[in-house]
Amino acid sequence: MEALRFAHTQSPHFHCRIFTPPTFNYTVKSSAADVRRTAPRASSISAAVSRAAAAAEKKPRPAASPELPLVSPSSLTSEPGCVLPKLPSHGENGSLGPSGIEYLTGILSSKVYDVAFESPLQLATNLSRKLGNNIWIKREDLQPQWKSVERLGATVVRVGDTYDEAQACAQKRAQEEGLTFVPPFDHPHVIMGQGTVGKEIMSQAKCCIDAIFVPVGGGGLIAGIAAYVKMVDPDVKIIGVEPNNANAMALSLHHGRRIMLDQVGGFADGVAVKVVGEETFRLCRDLIDGVVFVSRDAICASIRDMFEERRSILEPAGALALAGAEAYCKHYNQKDQNIVVIASGANMNFDRLGQVTDLS
């Protein structure tokens, strides 16, 4: 895959800005590209997340949620470095592995109002197995994965024009009917459930991992991965990737508080949130190493490249980390790094394929 070869000329369709949270303490070694963070203090992870992590360690993985393998690098690499994609196409219904929702099912009522966003299909799938047909998902748009959700027996209620409107409606209905509201990312169990992806990476990798690139929406996935990986190996960089026009996490880290965007771009709709979670922001502020911005053209190029290499079609949000890894490695002229990219979704809207082709 040419887009992932570290030693090639800059492509004109890439636009990259590297954002590093200003509150981090770094030890700079040989160059600006070789940055190693000091180990995070135990106090940097909240008690709630720590308790959830301990519970997750003790609780066996459900049989319905097998680990997704790291894909062998093959021609994705330029020796001596390599890129290891974590692909959703190996998982059920094109989503990435198990969800933290599995760790919440013991406290849920028989009916749940759930705003699923960062990985909507896996949330609904896992909940459907646990609780039967009494699942309600709030979301406003008509994406193809919702057909699979409905086939699982979930009732899909589409409301509002944005995720925030859908969440407000779900919270209101849950309060009125005495139900449990399940947030898609800002809950300790959800965060640590997402962190099982980090656990899989560290256990499956056959080489020393230098960096993990993670798509960022509300922040649950990257917060969970960072919470686990930084406790195991603080030298592994955790780098978030956001679209240029949906960069709520980077702006929040820059200002030291959560920032709500006036509007967000909808191309990578799986990460298009106006404001990140409170707990996810705090964890990202303490643990992650930076955020990369990429353009829509860069995302489309990564979708094309993954298809040409693996015959796997990623949705825009799923290709986000891939685009960010390339942009980062070009920016810092990285040629010998072992990189993991989280390809978080393969639920591509068929009608969007033409647009992706034109922009790639």
Tell me what each language-model feature is.
Residues 2-360:
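PLP-dependent amino-acid enzyme catalytic core
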